[in-house]
Amino acid sequence: MGRSSSKKKKKRGGSGRRGQLKDHGSNADEDNELLSEEITALSAIFQEDCKVVSDSRSPPQIAIKLRPYSKDMGYEDTDISAMLIVRCLPGYPYKCPKLQITPEQGLTTADAEKLLSLLEDQANSNAREGRVMIFNLVEAAQEFLSEIIPESHDEESVPCLTAHRSTQFIEQPMLSNIAKSCSGGPFVYGFIDLFSGLEDARNWSLTPDENRGIVSSVQSHPLDTSRILHQKPDKNLKRFEDHAKEEVALPAPIAKLNTVQEENVDDTSISSFDSSKSTDDVESGLFQNEKKESNLQDDTAEDDSTNSESESLGSWSSDSLAQDQVPQISKKDLLMVHLLRVACTSRGPLADALPQITDELHELGILSEEVLDLASKSSPDFNRTFEHAFNQNMASTSVPQFWEPPSDSCEPNASLPSSRYLNDFEELKPLGQGGFGHVVLCKNKLDGRQYAVKKIRLKDKEIPVNSRIVREVATLSRLQHQHVVRYYQAWFETGVVDPFAGANWGSKTAGSSMFSYSGAVSTEIPEQDNNLESTYLYIQMEYCPRTLRQVFESYNHFDKDFAWHLIRQIVEGLAHIHGQGIIHRDFTPNNIFFDARNDIKIGDFGLAKFLKLEQLDQDGGFSTDVAGSGVDSTGQAGTYFYTAPEIEQDWPKIDEKADMYSLGVVFFELWHPFGTAMERHVILTNLKLKGELPLKWVNEFPEQASLLRRLMSPSPSDRPSATELLKHAFPPRMESELLDNILRIMQTSEDSSVYDRVVSVIFDEEVLEMKSHQSSRSRLCADDSYIQYTEINTELRDYVVEITKEVFRQHCAKHLEVIPMRLLSDCPQFSRKTVKLLTNGGDMLELCYELRLPFVHWISVNQKSSFKRYEISHVYRRAIGHSPPNPCLQADFDIVGGTLSLTEAEVLKVIVDITTHIFHRGSCDIHLNHGDLLDAIWSWAGIKAEHRRKVAELLSMMGSLRPQSSERKLKWVFIRRQLLQELKLPEAVVNRLQTVASRFCGDADQALPRLRGALRADRPTRKALDELSNLLTYLRVWRIEEHVHIDVLMPPTESYHRNLFFQVFLTKENSSGTSNDGVLLAVGGRYDWLVQEVCDREHKMNLPGAVGVSLALETIFQHLPMDLRPIRNEVSTSVLVCSRGGGGLLVQRMELVAELWEKSIKAEFVPTPDPSLTEQYEYANEHEIKCLVIITESGVAQNQIEFVKVRHLELKKEKVVGREELVKFLLDAMAVQFRNPSVWS
């Protein structure tokens, strides 16, 4: 007997349903068309498993055979199936169809009833929204059947697992415990910071010009809700058709999981990067992609050829300019650019004004986009293009001087700007190539001291790489430690690359400088880069004459005290580096130096990975073949013995323990001198591959052998940190014992006199003044002004803030300002790295890390049950090295009270409205999850409680990638490897995690029914799925449907997001049309748990829940589209009140400007008693004021103004206006931007 839903339908009845039928009765033809299209799509998808019985007198009936995800996806067939019969009633899809389940084999009566109940709930939910549903019902049923496959079949099919299988590896008792929620394991959170990667990008800028190129303006200032995405109310039919095409045209791909080579699903090719890099790649920056495993290389030949082709097409060689640009650009345009260049030579009156002039001409429509681009190219490029177009004229002209290029472009040596490098330094000898540049020993002509100067060529086309280098250099400049190489200063110079020059690589600014690539990985120089102007970054560093490798080469006599002395200094330097969030990654004796006093200095951070910057630059790895020093290459061959296993195995998550492995090898070389190179090779090979140590050495130094084994443990978590070594591994020193005693007294004694004396010494004014002088002499040179942003950047920031405020106010939120700092003891602490400050009174202050906790305390104190608030304020993050805290502008929007899911939808609507006004449509992805759902997934996959935090940390690395994207599937390959190798998770558990990633994460409409079918319907899980379903329903009402994903593997960013939570990412497509890593813009969710925690602790009362979102405005500022321009409405045009004659007429000017201020007209005057008219015109030009109100001597009678002249400089219009009519005239003229002819008549 089949299980039918008809009886239950009769019991439910429902006047509400009749109301819906009445509303949609007039759309019967449209509903029939939807059903017809759905049946067509279902027949194409399920083919012989789908039967349609149609009768003209009754609604159609559809019978679909249900199977688990098995044969269609590449598994062995199973002995379980059922028949789903769907009878659509008039009014479908707004009326729920009648459903019947007929078990065929392997399905018990109880399971059939459960399945029918599940499908009824799913159908009712879809019918309320009027959405076609049969395909979703089938998917939910398939997931349900996959979960009840008999265990015998699971055991047989384990060897042939694929990425799409929901296999039953976990014992049934474990699956029944999903409802334990947080009590079943730790609540994991906080692996991504809203402002990750922004610390150094704001605090440091070495770019010569921070001004942005702004192309076009936004047309209107008021918020336009029509710009929000509008989608059709239903996307299922299109998805059916796409799915049908896939099923008919292509069989489903099979992707086995038991080998690395086949881990990538859906035939996504895995990119491989060859270890050989071109010279330009080495000079471009620190970070390059690591080479992948050799067994993945065959898949990428086509990709590599495509990339190389695109690069060649995008290059600006002289030949391509001459051949390609001339047919597209007229000779008239070329001649105009030539004349502009002649007028703007360095010796002329318009020196260096070419960019401004060309921009103005482009805005006026005189210069096209192509001509503007050509005008901005380097002189050699344009000259060749010009000569190619006018070669006949230049040969036959009687005035050859006219056709010649400007003297400063064809004779660069005639007038060279000053080169700081050539003026201040004298080259002594080359030291070799470093991690991201060439290094030369130089003598400073001013102080006579020797320095190592590194020169890096910044390629204009690779702005992200250049920005990354700048951030790294700024970071390294803050590593002020006695055992770390000092970085003194850095600066930019412009030069010309000549790849055929000799070894001398000195720069001649704006001239024909020579730069040699000798000694780099590749000597092949692309022809199109010849003789192009480039920007070079110079870094002045501390010079260290010897390396530890050189010491090892003459290390014949072993001294135990000397070994402990060196290793302590090395570990102290490492501890400082790791404390700043930096991994060296190339820690070898070649990069450990000795200064003039024979103290250890750690240097050459060419392969360093900055943990605090990696959120901006996740690129899968770094090249290990970049040369490191002049003594020995730091490529893969040179660093083999020192490379940690996790780096060799391409683990995606690398921490500072990789350096500790390298330290182990250095430690062993210090304690075991080698007689020959062969002896070193044999012993270190056995140590690395087998973990074997010379037995004689182990017996002589058992403690050192034990420490070495810990340092070189294959598992990073088993290795000690540098701080732990300093505390426990070294022989005690007398000064350390004295310091420990002082610290113990400070922490335990009731007498605060010791603490007060220490604080007094810290804040001693003489000591602080001395430190200030020292740091000012040694710190990397930066802008000597204290203005944080340029004028245009400030204007853009203000514009974004105003948009954000306006959206908040539209939703009736009230502004509540948060106190930016508080005493550390004033509120409970969460486990986060907040910025803490010490006052001269010994009190500890904490700067705001986030803006929500103070608001929750305010809710609790004021017992608010319904409230909307917003706040835009700075939060603070720890900086790297000796730098002030990093301020990050954040906007919060919160709703207290209201219906669950509905208020969540509103805060998402707020974010969509803001981003739609700033970025292009569809540029943001919304990732949804639920705390109870995440716990259910942990149990479903079999992740033990002790592993959840590390698993979540690894999975969060792909959270910024769109679910089901090829980039995310590629990232999973490496995450899977680390889960198996580091955590030693059973392969069956990792396979289930991959099933979650491949089937339960993705488009919300597809993932939700699959989750309902797969997960047990316990109360917490069912509640979580219902809340997600309701949220999606509300979002559709506001037309927020596209780019909404469910990501059940996404952990929350805060501990209090234990219900619905979300993350919003800004996505940008690359040149190949695929999306890169998303940029985190906003995080949010419900925080009922936090509200109740605070209320229970402080007031013992219950308050309604709350939901909020935090928007990273600082991130938005860094990713503003180039076509965004603040609204400069001419209504707000400033007026300059001027005078002509009459001794300056200062009183009259002051009176008139005050009157304009009272009428809310922006006005100013030149603040001098008697300015000349020329001075006033110059003032207007400098301050971009177009409208002048001129008071003349003849227009003043008895010290009273009778009339004035109103002049518009841009329109070249003028009118005499009486004093009484002036305000009205200005307001009317500004309303039409002064351009209506009737204004001036």
From Swiss-Prot:
Its main location: cytoplasm. Residues 819-1219 are annotated as: Histidyl-tRNA synthetase-like. Residues 37-148 form the RWD domain. CDD domains: RWD_RNF25, STKc_EIF2AK4_GCN2_rpt2. InterPro entries: aa-tRNA-synth_II/BPL/LPL, Anticodon-bd_dom_sf, HisRS-like_core, HisRS-related_dom, Kinase-like_dom_sf, Prot_kinase_dom, Protein_kinase_ATP_BS, RWD_dom. GO terms for biological process: cellular response to amino acid starvation; regulation of cytoplasmic translational initiation in response to stress; translation. It is found in: Cytoplasm. Residues 1-15 have a biased composition (Basic residues). The keyword Nucleotide-binding applies. GO terms for cellular component: cytoplasm. The active site is at 586 (proton acceptor). Expressed in roots, leaves, stems, buds, flowers, siliques and seedlings. Homodimer; homodimerization is important for kinase activation by uncharged tRNAs. Belongs to the protein kinase superfamily. Ser/Thr protein kinase family. GCN2 subfamily. This is eIF-2-alpha kinase GCN2. The gene is GCN2.
